[in-house]
Amino acid sequence: MKIFSLLILSLKITFLLTLLLGGLYPLAVFIVGKIFFPYQSEGSLIKDATGNVIGSALIGQKFDSPWYFHSRPSASDYDGLSSGGSNLAPSSLALIDTLRERTLRYRKENALSPTTPVPSDAVCASASGLDPHISFENGLLQVPRVAHERKADPKSIEELLRKHTEAPTWGILGERVVNVLLLNLELDKRYPKKIGY
């Protein structure tokens, strides 16, 4: 008889917790999100003037045209369905070759001298492969290339970069970063790239 009562009690607790944690709590979070955080609860989507979704402020995109600031490399080619890192060990020869190749390409694209330090986020993919940010230092090294390609004053491009720079969380966690999608959208508004330019 005692086992039967314990079984009934277990089933009641399981049902109650399933209802509470599997139904009421998610519903409450959904309602609070929709009311108080509508932009974030929809995925921080960025739309153009016609309402078409361009991307998300939370997910990186690939920019490889010389007139754009370039994002971090991605092991998953910015595919949200297969996000992740390369999972190569630091001692992996494949990783070392990839980093060497990316460093050479970054130096060439940005006309850097062999002694100019290359920021790690310019050649290393993030763990998710979807990071929307680059470091401020990475952005600074790309300013001359972007300014040249857009026929703009490098100082005005740098000002735009500084405007889009986010400070470390609480002033101490992390480093200054720049959301590449938001920065490139602002570039297109201020310095449109004409076809055949």
From Swiss-Prot:
Nucleus keyword on record: no
GO CC, alphabetical: plasma membrane
Membrane spanning stretches: 13-33
Record's keyword annotation contains Transport: yes
Membrane topology of the entry: Single-pass membrane protein
Record Pfam families: KdpC
Subcellular location per the Swiss-Prot or TrEMBL entry: Cell inner membrane
Entry keywords, A to Z: ATP-binding, Cell inner membrane, Cell membrane, Ion transport, Membrane, Nucleotide-binding, Potassium, Potassium transport, Transmembrane, Transmembrane helix, Transport
GO MF terms, alphabetically ordered: ATP binding; P-type potassium transmembrane transporter activity
Family annotation (InterPro entries): KdpC (IPR003820)
Origin: domain of life: Bacteria
Function: Part of the high-affinity ATP-driven potassium transport (or Kdp) system, which catalyzes the hydrolysis of ATP coupled with the electrogenic transport of potassium into the cytoplasm. This subunit acts as a catalytic chaperone that increases the ATP-binding affinity of the ATP-hydrolyzing subunit KdpB by the formation of a transient KdpB/KdpC/ATP ternary complex.
Subunit and partners: The system is composed of three essential subunits: KdpA, KdpB and KdpC.
Alphabetized PANTHER family for the sequence: POTASSIUM-TRANSPORTING ATPASE C CHAIN, POTASSIUM-TRANSPORTING ATPASE KDPC SUBUNIT
HAMAP family in UniProt: KdpC (MF_00276)
NCBIfam families per the UniProt record, alphabetical: kdpC, PRK00315.1
Record-stated family: Belongs to the KdpC family.
Record's protein name: Potassium-transporting ATPase KdpC subunit
